[in-house]
Amino acid sequence: MRQEHRSILSVGRSIPSRAASLLPQLDSPPSASARIRKLATLAPHRRDAYLVAKCASGQGELVGNRGLLGHLPSSSMPPQKSPQSPVTCEQRVLISNEHGEKLVGLLHQTSSKKLVILCHGFRATKDDSILVDLVDAFTKEGISAFRFDFSGNGESEGEFQYGSYRKEAADLRSVVLYFSKQKYDIIALVGHSKGGNAVLLYASKYNDVPIIVNISGRFALERGIDGRLGKNFMQRINKDGYIDVKNRKGELEYRVSKASLEDRLSTDTLLSSRAISKDCRVLTIHGAKDEIVPAEDARQFAAHIPNHELRIMAEANHRYTGHEAELTSLVLGFVRRHLYHRSTPRLRPKL
């Protein structure tokens, strides 16, 4: 699969000085392989040398709390805060889904091949602040992370669809297969809002990722529609075949087709929840003051998913405004606990 790379700026990551200080010594050798050989002799830690060399060869960008460290003089390098701070390299990755549409994502590569995949919500993108905060937490833990745009969203190809729950789960399958072929150990899938539905649907169909985190996903998909489409939406869509959703200025935001609405209404969250393997660890986090999806939906997931843990955050809304650190801590703690203390064998795909 072809990969496309571009310069990425990142904030909030700590790069050890032992690795970052190697970049000024690279004197522009004639080839990427020459750079890698030179770095192998310079770096005192083999995995750090590999990551710095990979970034220097054009396969990604070494990032730190001031952005692209390779573009800064050594005197500008941030001080080393901890000898255990991970090196992180970011790559822009293109992955084809089953329809041939290119899904665009960012791989945050640490020295570990353990990987968490993060999924955005309705009308959001891979740059959603919730996902960015989670990526920062995982990479500081030394775990690689990948965030991407579902088809029809953000930079990815395809047409935006109102429903598309099954298609987004299929997009996620394409991503999992891609990284599995690259020999990554995919340890967890994390999704916010509609992305939570995507990771749960994935788990109900495939039994190959051991940890699932559903943040504010919706159980009762028949609810919440009139908030976006207005009253009497069924009569209107049956009459015209579609409904145009406009913003407060009267500008068209997106069109809801009858087929996409039917896709949402026919997605059975009860059946899919019960189909998740008891060997899969599932965490649902929900805000008690969620103004988009009621907390009762989280309790419904808890009632029907076999191996499930529920956390209700008393003061949090749908975006976890003012509670971002607590959300990140819950997600990271759950993944860390089951990653390092799991006793069950690696899950196998359902036949």
Question: How would you describe each model-predicted region?
Answer:
Residues 253-275, 296:
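Active-site nucleophile elbow and catalytic-triad environment of alpha/beta-hydrolase enzymes
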